[in-house]
Amino acid sequence: MTKTIHIEGMMCPHCVRFATEALNKLEGVSAVVSLEQKNAVCTITGDVSDDTLRNAIVAAGYQVTGIE
């Protein structure tokens, strides 16, 4: 399954790295984060809830404006 997380608050490549690391630490998640698109495209295997994805991004210091 693929989900797109819309993220606010990323300003630089370091932000992208922090957001990527936060998502990739979750078991079953492989994320590609884009500063330009202000999103993360996650390939998910297993049972990972939207709340888990949202909490990982918020814990990294960013805001989630939507998950599709």
Predicted regions and their residues:
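Short glycine-/aliphatic-rich beta-strand segments at the starts of folded cytosolic domains
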Residues: M1-G9
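Short amphipathic alpha-helix segments
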Residues: M10-N24
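Small side chains
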Residues: A19, A31, A40-C42
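C-terminal structural segments of small proteins and small subunits
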Residues: A22, C42-E68
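Short acidic amphipathic segments
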Residues: L23-V32
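RNA-recognition motif
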Residues: V32-N39, I67-E68
